[in-house]
Amino acid sequence: MEIGGLVYLILIITIINLSFGETNNYCKIKCRKGIHTLCKFGTSMKPNCGRNVVKAYGLTNDEKNEILKRHNDFRQNVAKGLETRGKPGPQPPAKNMNVLVWNDELAKIAQTWANQCDFNHDDCRNTAKYQVGQNIAISSTTATQFDRPSKLIKQWEDEVTEFNYKVGLQNSNFRKVGHYTQMVWGKTKEIGCGSIKYIEDNWYTHYLVCNYGPGGNDFNQPIYERK
């Protein structure tokens, strides 16, 4: 389903309790480098954050819906040509911007990686269905409460201020705009995220990992079809 028409559907998440480890041998999944996250760390979902005091890991239903709605609202805004920021702006409207739906398998892989408290991208996160893209964000505050997912996602959205749609995505600008371009990659259909919240030296830290299928961010390719 695509954004850009008059009908915009917000999909309510249904959580399905699946054991993906029983149906997929992740150790056989090929990536450009490295061992698959679920092969390397298993599916126990236990956090591994050293001496940090973990307060929560995993996402609530409300947080999942918040993440999904935030992505689709932003994608809709871009697709309609309403995103005025950029170098230059506004961003051109799109005709192939899919409405994202939640994918529990992508979320399980993302959660397993978030649980490692490693603030780099994992090497291998593909599924049998998708080559998977990824966005990560972290926020720390002394306000004795954790930032909402939307505040972390805003970091990705704001990269649009550095994006030149006339140039597109290149190796030279990837570090500045790669989170934004993955968020609005037109052909991406599904998303699944993981989260961990912990306290380190009185800093309330929230680490968010989102996986996207199919992934985007192919250099020298349009991020979406323009109207």
Curated annotation (Swiss-Prot):
* One cellular component term from this protein's GO annotations in UniProt: extracellular region
Q: Return any one Pfam family short name.
A: CAP
Q: Where is the signal peptide?
A: 1-23
Q: Report which superkingdom the organism of origin falls in.
A: Eukaryota
What is the reported tissue distribution? Answer: Expressed by the venom gland.
Write down the PANTHER family for this protein, in alphabetical order. CYSTEINE-RICH SECRETORY PROTEIN-RELATED (PTHR10334)
Q: Does the keyword Disulfide bond apply?
A: yes
| Cell compartments where the protein resides | Secreted
Name of the protein this chain belongs to:
Venom allergen 5.01
Taking every annotated instance into account, which residue ranges of this chain make up the domain SCP?
68-212
Tell me the disulfide pairings in this chain: C27-C39, C31-C124, C49-C117, C193-C210
Family designation: Belongs to the CRISP family. Venom allergen 5-like subfamily.
| CDD domains named among the record's database cross-references | CAP_euk
The protein's UniProt keywords, in alphabetical order, are: Allergen, Disulfide bond, Secreted, Signal
Q: Where are the transmembrane segments?
A: none
